[in-house]
């Protein structure tokens, strides 16, 4: 069986691996789609291996091909997404023993009910493979505790930022400012529900935020009256700019 494996810096290979031998608590999923995450790219460029090759791929969807006797959350033929979290052998695709860039994925401990989730009827499996990055965007909103009426800024309109915007909109948060350098991504942000978009290459971000969200008093001077910032750009400058703008 084939599997994309990372061997070192910029050294990924399509390796032949042993066929999986599942047990009564495990499952096998025939992979239909697996996304390539920014994390995968970072792993490849940095050669992030624990001293031995590791499989890649953690955004996957497919069809259940086999289930062990103790697995009750899914049946053969079900269309599912696979949760890549650690089930005892490391997180899938980011250092663990399994990875989604393979035709047939071994899913250990599927019997715990937290590994396989059925895909709704009418949703194609390519779309379903976006469940993992969607979950990351949703969790950022969960952690922010943003609520209707809050003024929210989302830095970065890649997949995670866009899913955060979609989640905010779904939860009744309308005053959303999206920030990115890409015109195409800002257009997508508006489609997802952003009320305002800013491009740092042309806009004075902090001045514009004061204009859009109003000003709040602070001991060292007025700041944007923004309630929640969600950082999804990965840019070091943003991490520094937010506290600086409040001092």
Place the predicted regions along the sequence by residue.
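Short Gly/Pro-enriched turn/cap motifs at secondary-structure boundaries
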Residues: 7, 18-19, 51-58, 93-97, ...
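NAD(P)H dinucleotide-binding glycine-rich loop of Rossmann-like/cofactor-binding domains
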Residues: 86-155
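Hydrophobic/small residue at the entry helix of a nucleotide-binding pocket
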Residues: 160
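Glycine-rich beta-strand-centered segment in the early N-terminal region that forms part
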Residues: 19-34, 45-86, 111, 120-122
